[in-house]
């Protein structure tokens, strides 16, 4: 019997995100779920460990809001847009409180997720060998990474990293059905493996479609519904990042955040206006249109570049 998992972001976060959880965050600049991130902040979840190969300002906002105690990642930065100031304040000054970061390479975090998704306890990699990352650990100690010999006799040595299996994951996709079968195209990043490694997953999507539409294009299904506990329909749910086929990156808005968050007071003003001051994503988008105008909003929408159709018959 089909079971609908559709609910609001508020309901999903309230029901499935608990204090002290280890949370996997999907997306790689593309299709990052700000609708869930902002709801976690509004509900004041605490003592979270957040995991992602590379973090952007979604992590910075959770850190500034006091949600995060620990990070598993390779960096927390905003690419060409500049540094993330809440992360630096927390690491350097303990504002709002001190946080810890277990520092891996980008690939090593991905490999840990891969091991978790495959159900194996660890995975050997070439990454990290010979670097200071082998010598430093925030809280995992000797269990962060270990050198292992090739058991098949080559004599080669590898860095073995443990499987990463977060309590919960969340990510954003273009479309999903009511049962949680998720389809994504464009930059996948870590999402196919990180979300499989998580024990449960909340998915936000641009639109909910029928099971028939999902079934007609199975190769785009990157996560099956049995992993998903909640489906949140949220158009523009990844703004200010992009979602391919729906809207582009809002560079001006990202620069605005980087600029205003340079001071604690500026960051608080931004958050009061764009996160705490709106009830949900609908309110967020309404405020955006009221502030910047409908033309600016519509200019973000993606141009049409449709893929060729394929024949699945046999």
Predicted region positions:
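Conserved alpha/beta enzyme-core scaffold
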Residues: 1-314
């Amino acid at each position: 019997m089909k079971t609908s998992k559709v609910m609001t972001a508020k309901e999903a976060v309230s029901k499935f995100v608990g204090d002290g959880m280890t949370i996997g965050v999907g997306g790689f600049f593309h299709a990052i779920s700000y609708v869930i991130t902002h709801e976690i902040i509004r509900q004041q979840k605490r003592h979270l460990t957040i995991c992602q190969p590379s973090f952007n300002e979604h992590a910075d906002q959770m850190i500034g809001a006091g949600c995060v105690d620990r990070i598993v990642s390779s960096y927390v930065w905003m690419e060409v847009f500049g540094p993330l100031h809440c992360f630096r304040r927390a690491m350097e000054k303990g504002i709002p409180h001190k946080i810890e970061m277990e520092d891996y390479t980008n690939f090593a975090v991905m490999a840990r997720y891969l091991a978790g998704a495959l159900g194996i306890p660890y995975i050997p990699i070439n990454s990290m060998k010979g670097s200071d990352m082998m010598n430093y650990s925030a809280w995992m100690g000797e269990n962060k990474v270990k050198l292992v010999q090739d058991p098949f006799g080559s004599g080669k040595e590898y860095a073995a990293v443990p499987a990463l299996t977060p309590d919960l994951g969340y990510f954003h996709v273009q479309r999903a059905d009511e049962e949680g079968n998720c389809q994504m195209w464009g930059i996948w990043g870590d999402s196919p493996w990180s979300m499989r490694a998580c024990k449960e997953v909340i998915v936000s999507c641009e639109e909910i479609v029928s099971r028939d539409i999902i079934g007609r294009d199975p190769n785009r299904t990157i996560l099956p519904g049995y992993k998903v506990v909640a489906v949140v329909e949220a158009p523009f749910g990844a703004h200010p990042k992009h979602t391919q086929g729906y809207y582009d990156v809002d560079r001006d808005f990202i620069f605005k955040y980087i600029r205003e968050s340079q001071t604690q007071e500026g960051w608080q003003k931004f958050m009061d206006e764009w996160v705490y001051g709106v009830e949900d994503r609908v309110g967020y988008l309404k405020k955006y249109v009221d502030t910047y105008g409908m033309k600016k909003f519509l200019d973000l929408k993606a141009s049409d570049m449709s893929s060729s159709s394929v024949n699945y018959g046999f």
